[in-house]
């Protein structure tokens, strides 16, 4: 879709992006799919659509139907959600807000090079899509929690994640585990922030995710 179509249908972008990824995956349907943050929500959408042999959502954004909203998540997303004009533009993030939301396990000095490398103006639209999904008909992040045919799905949570805390991952896991006969699993990594894929010790998270995806098991898998 061109930019004009995106402006005309601002609430469809997430689903259109997922459709594009789906087309790319069609010729490689039997793949392990992993995603972080909103990428975790996209993993759920793709598995729900029949793609993948296993999926791992790492500190994933909530899909429609997940209501957990801890204070730290409100604080981390407020700089974008406070302005109703932000769905229509990219919103920069300050060093202070970045440190709180993503790199809170680091000092401000340690966070600075991470900010310089990775911080870019964020799409306000995608945060509004996620933040208001539960009151949006046909929301872009809608999935069928009762899909018995989807591939196994693991939710990984970071115990010190401010922007998408363990409560979000736990509720998402429980809704899937209760309603679907497909394999659903949950693993908490205590003390890890939203920057879990980049901070020290990331190898343990990556190794666990891959080991699980190669031999999925259901349930609360504890913490490590």
Language model segments and positions:
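Active-site nucleophile elbow and catalytic-triad environment of alpha/beta-hydrolase enzymes
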Residues: 123-145
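Flexible "cap/lid" loop of the alpha/beta hydrolase fold
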Residues: 53-88, 128-135
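Conserved hydrolase catalytic core segment
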Residues: 32-66
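Conserved alpha/beta-hydrolase catalytic His-Asp/Glu region
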Residues: 93-128
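Short beta-strand/loop motif that positions the catalytic acidic residue
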Residues: 149, 155-157, 161
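Conserved alpha/beta-hydrolase "acid-adjacent" motif
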Residues: 162-171
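Catalytic active-site module of serine/aspartate enzymes centered on a nucleophile-bearing elbow/loop
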Residues: 179, 183-224
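Conserved acidic catalytic loop of the alpha/beta-hydrolase fold
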Residues: 16-31
């Amino acid at each position: 879709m061109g930019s004009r179509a995106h402006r005309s249908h601002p609430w469809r972008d997430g689903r259109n992006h997922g459709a594009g990824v789906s087309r790319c995956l069609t010729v490689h349907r039997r793949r392990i799919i992993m995603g972080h943050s909103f990428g975790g929500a996209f993993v759920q959408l793709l598995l729900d659509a029949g793609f993948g042999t296993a999926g791992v959502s790492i500190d994933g954004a909530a899909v429609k139907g997940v209501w957990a909203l801890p204070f730290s998540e409100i604080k981390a997303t407020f700089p974008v959600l406070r302005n109703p004009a932000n769905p229509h533009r990219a919103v920069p993030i300050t060093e202070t807000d970045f440190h709180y939301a993503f790199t809170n396990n680091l000092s401000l000095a340690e966070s600075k090079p991470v900010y310089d490398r990775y911080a870019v103006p964020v799409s306000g639209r995608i945060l509004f899509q996620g933040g208001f999904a539960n009151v949006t008909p046909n929301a872009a992040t809608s999935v069928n929690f009762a899909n018995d045919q989807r591939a196994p799905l693991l939710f990984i949570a970071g115990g010190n994640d401010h922007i998408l805390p363990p409560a979000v991952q736990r509720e998402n896991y429980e809704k899937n585990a209760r309603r679907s006969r497909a394999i659903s699993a949950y693993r908490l990594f205590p003390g890890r922030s939203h920057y879990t894929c980049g901070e020290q010790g990331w190898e343990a998270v990556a190794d666990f995710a891959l080991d699980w995806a190669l031999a999925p098991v259901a349930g609360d898998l504890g913490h490590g």
